């Protein structure tokens, strides 16, 4: 038998973190002993035993940060309701191949529907899809230089998609490994890339654990967003949400009516109030369709206009100096790099400001008394 070599590669082989709460609770039911956190060496040993490798040679080139040096990391802090605004803002403001990660299939489906209504041409990818459809969406994503793929962690590993410029974590990943592998879809083959972590208040705990595991002593820098441009996206997203709700209601009503009519026909039943109910149903359906048509017309009217206006604004001159609107050459990574470069300068300027010592209330009274005596 010829000699055979087996190689095992991973960006997170030596990464260790605290045991997730759900796993700790599950283990407590079966054992009373406390679960010990593995060291990197112990973790590697267990992997070698599972794989069945004899006399392994370990080469660890993992960096402390866990991510590539040419990857720019940042975050957006917002409420859960505003995530859609920020995501749509980013997609419309910065062109390029973008991969959006979600924690659940339900979230992927919702975003794909919403962004589809907004004409962003999203391509969903999750485990519930047929393999043929998954491969088809991946091919479409690779063929479009401004492609948008919305996926679960099924796309976080094992995929080498060239020239992915942006990775957006729509939800904070539950583990540090997921964050590293998701972010690793960009900044590949010595190319630059940017990863944006969207964080709501309830996800702060997962964010803190992520920073702790990756050895981050400081928060990820904030991605710059022009507030007045963000406001322009809100109206579109809100109308798209309403359209989504109306379409869902129409589908449910049609499904319910179809099932009821089919059951009545199969059992040869005659409903006394059939005509009255039918008239009421038709009126309700007509109302829903009218509302849906009205909202679609309203959205189409907004979509026909320029989202981010060109030119100089006299009301907000400082905004125009800092951010050029509708600049096709403007890249998200360049904007973020500029912000990161300015952070030390701003801190230095802040430290240079003279500290004004405020006099206490008692000192003021004494000074007043002394003036009166004079």
Specify the residue positions occupied by each region the protein language model found.
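Loop/turn-to-beta-strand initiation segments
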Residues: 2-7, 97, 121, 144-148
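Conserved two-lobed SF2 helicase motor
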Residues: 138-157
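Conserved interdomain hinge at the start of the Helicase C-terminal
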Residues: 65-117
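A short beta-strand element within the Helicase C-terminal
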Residues: 157-172, 193-198
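Conserved helicase motor "Helicase C" RecA-like lobe of SF1/SF2 P-loop NTPases
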Residues: 103-137
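A short beta-strand-to-loop transition that corresponds to the Sensor-1 phosphate-sensing loop
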Residues: 8-13, 62, 102-105, 152-154, ...
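Post-DEXD/H (motif II) to motif III coupling segment of the RecA-like Helicase ATP-binding lobe
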Residues: 1-60
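Arginine-glycine-biased low-complexity disordered regions
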Residues: 1-3, 19-34, 113, 117, ...
């Amino acid at each position: 038998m010829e000699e055979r070599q087996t190689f095992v590669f991973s960006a997170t082989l030596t990464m260790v973190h605290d045991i997730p709460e759900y796993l700790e609770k599950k283990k407590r039911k079966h054992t009373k002993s406390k679960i010990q956190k593995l060291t990197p060496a112990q973790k590697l040993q267990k992997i070698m035993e599972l794989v069945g490798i004899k006399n392994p040679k370990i080469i660890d080139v993992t960096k402390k940060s866990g991510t590539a040096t040419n990857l720019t990391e940042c975050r957006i802090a917002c409420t859960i309701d505003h995530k859609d605004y920020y995501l749509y803002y980013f997609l419309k403001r910065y062109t390029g191949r973008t991969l959006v990660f979600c924690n659940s299939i339900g979230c992927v489906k919702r975003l794909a529907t919403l962004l589809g209504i907004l004409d962003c041409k999203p391509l969903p990818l999750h485990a519930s899809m047929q393999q043929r459809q998954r491969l088809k969406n991946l091919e479409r994503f690779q063929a479009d230089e401004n492609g948008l793929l919305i996926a679960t962690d099924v796309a976080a590993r094992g995929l080498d998609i060239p020239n992915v410029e942006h990775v957006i974590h729509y939800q904070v990943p539950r583990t540090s490994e997921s964050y590293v592998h998701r972010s690793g879809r960009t900044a590949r083959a010595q190319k630059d890339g940017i990863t944006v972590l969207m964080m709501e208040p309830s996800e702060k705990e997962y964010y803190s654990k992520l920073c702790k595991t990756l050895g981050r002593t400081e928060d990820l820098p904030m991605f710059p967003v022009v507030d007045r441009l963000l406001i322009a996206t809100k109206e579109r997203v809100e109308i798209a949400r309403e359209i989504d709700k109306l379409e869902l209601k129409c589908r449910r009503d049609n499904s319910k009516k179809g099932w009821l009519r089919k059951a009545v026909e199969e059992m040869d039943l005659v409903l006394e109030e059939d005509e009255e109910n039918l008239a009421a149903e038709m009126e309700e359906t007509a109302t829903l369709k009218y509302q849906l048509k009205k909202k679609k017309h309203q959205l189409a009217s907004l979509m026909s206009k320029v989202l981010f206006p060109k030119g100089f604004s006299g009301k907000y001159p400082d905004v125009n100096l800092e951010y050029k609107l509708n600049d096709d050459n403007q890249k998200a990574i360049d904007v973020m790099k500029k912000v990161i470069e300015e952070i030390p300068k701003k801190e230095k300027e802040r430290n240079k400001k003279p500290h004004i010592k405020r006099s206490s209330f008692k000192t003021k009274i004494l000074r007043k008394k002394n003036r009166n005596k004079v």
